[in-house]
């Protein structure tokens, strides 16, 4: 289960459901050592996709590597470097349910099936620029074959 958790987190790092998190400043904030201030009430868009693809935070960000989520690696990163469900008091209320439901579904499939990418899937993947959420151009098509016991 631990590796499945790392796998799931890496998928959401590379392909978060939404590319940004919206917030509103609850008070004035001035960046240390500058005169730059975000005023109370200012609407902010936090670029989760950009943060989670930043090579300074995640070396080789285009590489799929579930080990980015081992305990030591997570402890070494800023807690706001991973935002697939937002964070704080306004984070996604269904995040835990969605994660558990997805993991149970994955286990149910891979337990008795082999999963391959279908030839209809375009590789390398391209993002669909017309999609509001992160989606791949042409979709992802899979071939699922039942494995004999």
Stretch-by-stretch model annotation:
Residues 1-35:
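Conserved cytochrome P450 K-helix E-x-x-R motif and the immediately C-terminal K′/meander segment
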Residues 8-12, 65, 86, 103-111:
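Amphipathic alpha-helical interaction motifs in eukaryotic regulatory proteins
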Residues 46-73:
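Conserved cytochrome P450 K-helix/beta-meander segment immediately N-terminal to the heme-binding cysteine loop
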Residues 48, 102, 142-144:
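Hydrophobic, repeat-rich solenoid/adaptor surfaces of innate immune receptors and signaling proteins
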Residues 72-102, 127-130:
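Cytochrome P450 heme-thiolate "Cys pocket" and heme-binding signature region
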Residues 97-132:
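Cytochrome P450 heme-binding "Cys pocket" and the immediately downstream C-terminal segment
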Residues 131-149:
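C-terminal helix/juxtamembrane-tail motif
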